[in-house]
Amino acid sequence: MHPRFETAFAQLPAALQAALAPLIADTYFPAMLSAEQVADVRRQSGLDDDALAFALLPLAAACAQTEISHFNVGAVARGLSGNLYFGGNMEFRGAAMQQTIHAEQSAITHAWMRGETGLAAITVNYTPCGHCRQFMNELNSGLTLRINLPGRAPSQLGDYLPDAFGPRDLDIKTLIFDTENHGYALKGDALTQAAIAAANRSHAPYSQSPSGLAIETRDGEIFTGSYAENAAFNPSLPPLQAALNLMSLNGYAWADIKRVALAERDDATIVQRDATAATLKALGFTNLELVTLA
């Protein structure tokens, strides 16, 4: 078990501990449960979907990286597949505050990068901030996304975001979690191809500037991130954050980064390379490889 989970795990009910123990024993537990695993954990613990998501929040919050605020937020996203995806807020000391990943963004992007096609619900241990409410409005679930908070009846995103402005107001048809392929040809080695594939999946309808990023760890694992643009612009999530999020949730440290490749167009309206390099430098990594989409 990864050390970050030990304290939270010890506080779980005994039946839930017994059900989860073999699943999270690996140091590189991927911070998600498949639909089959969820069904088995529910059977052993006696918890329904919502109760299980609430019970898992301490484990999700344990994934947070909060060097600045020291305030851990956890989120658990339930995909249409029945899979559960953990998320935690992530802060990067030495980088701009805008590079922060919120817990809801973490869980949602985690599900997206795993190939999920939509969300049925998201459970959070604190009320979503306005930034996250706007971010969630870019999903294909729209204002109907179910939001579960401790001590409150389930609500929909529309209850938290009245008079919403979003992609539908701009006649955007393809949303986050919908199938997207920008059609750029794969080339180069495995890391380069992974970055291009991530760019092909990116959601960039406002700037028309798709981008993707791939991280290779020292043990040869590759984690990718796709750019997630937002109708309100500022809540957009860069591809580096999506990849760092996936890597961290899988139990890796920033020191495990071996190579990073960023794929974007030379003539892109929105340029990721400078902010990407600056954030990587804050994490102690300085060799960003650039890949031109063509």
UniProtKB/Swiss-Prot annotation:
Binding site for Zn(2+): H102, C129, C132
Transmembrane segments: none
Catalytic activity entry: cytidine + H2O + H(+) = uridine + NH4(+); 2'-deoxycytidine + H2O + H(+) = 2'-deoxyuridine + NH4(+)
A GO biological-process term: cytidine deamination
Its EC number(s): 3.5.4.5
Gene Ontology MF terms: cytidine deaminase activity; identical protein binding; zinc ion binding
One cellular component (GO) term of this entry: cytosol
Domain of life of the native organism: Bacteria
The CMP/dCMP-type deaminase domain, residue ranges: 48-168, 186-294
Keyword DNA damage: no
Cross-referenced Pfam families: dCMP_cyt_deam_1, dCMP_cyt_deam_2
InterPro entries the UniProt entry points to: APOBEC/CMP_deaminase_Zn-bd, CMP_dCMP_dom, Cyd/dCyd_deaminase_Zn-bd, Cyt/Deoxycyt_deaminase, Cyt_deam_dimer, Cytidine_deaminase-like, Cytidine_deaminase_bacteria
Record HAMAP family: Cyt_deam
Subunit structure: Homodimer.
Family annotation (NCBIfam families): cyt_deam_dimer, PRK09027.1
Protein name listed in UniProt: Cytidine deaminase
UniProt source species: Cronobacter sakazakii (strain ATCC BAA-894)
Gene designation: cdd
